[in-house]
């Protein structure tokens, strides 16, 4: 773990919210998202160095809305003013605060603190966790969702022209047969560098999820994310056992204990680790 070269005194905390319209709405099982409503936190040290943190309001992930996040941030702010940071362990101030849950808000504060610590020590942020980077870049995943198949194919072709190679096809709003046909049509016009996953966001019935899982590999899918309700762990384990591709948990991951349980019980083959649901990256580390 990185050792701070000097103590950092927090002088001020500024809080902002911003609603950002999306160019195109994203349709998932049970919800349509047409804007990003984000919380921004700016933490300023006595040296006037500052760190920025951000988190999206995500009611389906953390139960938080932007107005509630703003109020929670005002509450947390009082615990940081005049706080002296001496090590990364001082990030525990967020976990130890009286504020219950509000993990998205806490993750925005944590990123701002990490950004501030990195700047005060003149290093890139990743070096707080590791001395060397394992990779210099990662691909961006492009969503394919919520339109007619002809519109989705047009969007997919445009994304290919823009250089995207990794795609997540949103499924679960239709029956399995319809979504399998969608995936087949999209993957068929991709090239050999394309990678496709399917994400049901808990939208399938057990029967449709089973049918999709059995045939996913044949339509070009590499892994299948959150096929049914996360609470139906035994049924998800059954789907994982006979799925033609690896399965992935997402809505079922809200804590490190969830991560451990999913692995120990082989509920799914892997998981989507969103730090917003854990209260920040340090907890995941």
List each language-model region with its residue ranges.
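Catalytic core of soluble alpha/beta enzymes
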Residues: 169, 174-285
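N-terminal capping/lid subdomain adjacent to the active-site entrance of alpha/beta enzymes
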Residues: 2-196, 201-203, 207-210, 214-218
